[in-house]
Amino acid sequence: MKPLDFRRIALSLEGAEEGSHMGAADFRVGGRIFATLASEKQGYGNLMLTPELQAGFVGELPDVFLPIHGGWGRMGMTHIRLAKASEDVLAGALRAAWKLRLEKNKGTKKKRTPKRG
């Protein structure tokens, strides 16, 4: 797979939109990021997963998935090696990140500023 495939599949998910974060393409649903191409020059896509989901993906396909280095990786942020991923694997991983973001969005309320009288 290539970054164009990552982009195509990410944008095929309902409500997904492309944005930019620190100069890199990101993919959002409900205004929140679920995946990025911040590491595309290194051959990776990035997925916003939970540590548990990350462990499952890495355990099943360690040649395709690896935690992002440092604290982000400990929080579940995961690289997917695009050259080693099949379309089905990439689509499944993006769908998992998208679904997780949708679930998190349901529990997120926007802060309201108090009315001044």
State the predicted function of each range.
Residues 1-117:
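Charge-dense, helix-prone N-terminal extensions
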